[in-house]
Amino acid sequence: MSDSHEAESTTRDFSSFNSTSREFAELTDAEVFNSHLCGKIATTSKLNLDSVRDLSIAYTPGVARVCEAIHEDPSLVHDYTWTGRNVAIISDGTAVLGLGDIGPQAALHVMEGKAQLFQRFVGLNGVPIVLDTTNVDELFDTICHIAPSFGAINLEDISAPRCFELERRLIDHINIPVMHDDQHGTAIVTTA
C-alpha cells in the first residue's frame, strides 16, 4: 500500500467514528482488563518469511545490499528502514493526564494507547518507551542515543518545567523532529 493510499485510508477510517457523540461506552472491568492482557500493540513483519528466498531477501545475504547502500548514502535510511514511519513515544510517567505522577511502569499503558492512535489515524508506527529516571540529563542522553532508530521523537507526560528544557535541548541536538505532545498537541487541538 502506498503512503498516499495509507493516508487516505486512515482519514476515511477516522470519519467512521461518530464525532457528535461525547459519551463513552459503558465497560466492565473484565472487558477492559481482558482486552489489555499482554499489552495493546505488537510488531509484525511487512515481508513474507515463507521460503529460503524470502529469508535471503529479508535477512542474509539480501540485507547486506541495503546496509551498504545506506552506508554510502545515509539519507537512504528513511527509505529503507522503519525510521521514516517510526516515532518514539517517550515518557517518565511524571505528568500523566488525569493521573499525575504514576511512574514509568503505570504510564507504559498510556504510551501503548498513543502508539495505537498514531497507527490507526496517521499510519505511523509508535514505539512506547518509558524511562525510569526524572533527571533531565539522563533523559536527554538516553533519547540522543536511541534517536537514530526513529524518524521523530514524541515527548509525552513529562512534568514541567523539565519537559521544556528537555524539548529545547533535543531540538538543538538531534536531527529529527521533536514534538512535546502536552504542549504542541494542546495547541493544535485548541486552534483546530
Enumerate the predicted regions with their spans.
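A glycine-rich, Thr/Ser-enriched phosphate-binding loop motif common to dinucleotide/cofactor-binding enzymes
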Residues: 179-192
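N-terminal ligand-binding/catalytic initiation module
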Residues: 2-174
